[in-house]
């Protein structure tokens, strides 16, 4: 799966939270200043090309919906970050969190318990 831009992620969050949407509904949900219809339509079609959304036709218009779950995207994104910044090592990623004090001892214990349960 290809990585998403910030704007694409913003639109995907709308699909994950609200379900199927028409482009007009997407625009209504966005903050001011509202982007032009064609801009959002182009971004949504790009998401469809990338496989993140699909559509159902209603006459001349389309209602779009997420074809990839938020959890699935999160896993893919995490894998990409670990690969790109930590040499594909989840140990290096977690070690970085520990060194930066971004993860607590209790959270580490939970991780260990999860790993032990997987065995």
Per-segment meaning from a language model:
Residues 4-7, 58-77:
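Short, cationic-aromatic polyanion-contact patches
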């Amino acid at each position: 799966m290809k990585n998403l831009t910030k704007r694409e992620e913003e639109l995907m969050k709308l699909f994950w939270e609200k379900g199927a949407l028409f482009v007009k509904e997407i625009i209504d949900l966005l903050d001011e200043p509202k982007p032009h219809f064609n801009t959002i339509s182009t971004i949504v079609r790009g998401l469809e090309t990338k496989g993140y959304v699909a559509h159902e036709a209603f006459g001349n218009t389309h209602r779009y919906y997420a074809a990839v779950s938020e959890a699935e995207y999160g896993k893919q994104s995490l894998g990409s970050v670990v690969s790109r910044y930590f040499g594909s090592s989840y140990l290096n990623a977690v070690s970085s969190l520990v060194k930066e004090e971004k993860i607590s001892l209790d959270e580490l214990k939970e991780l260990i318990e999860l790993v032990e349960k997987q065995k």
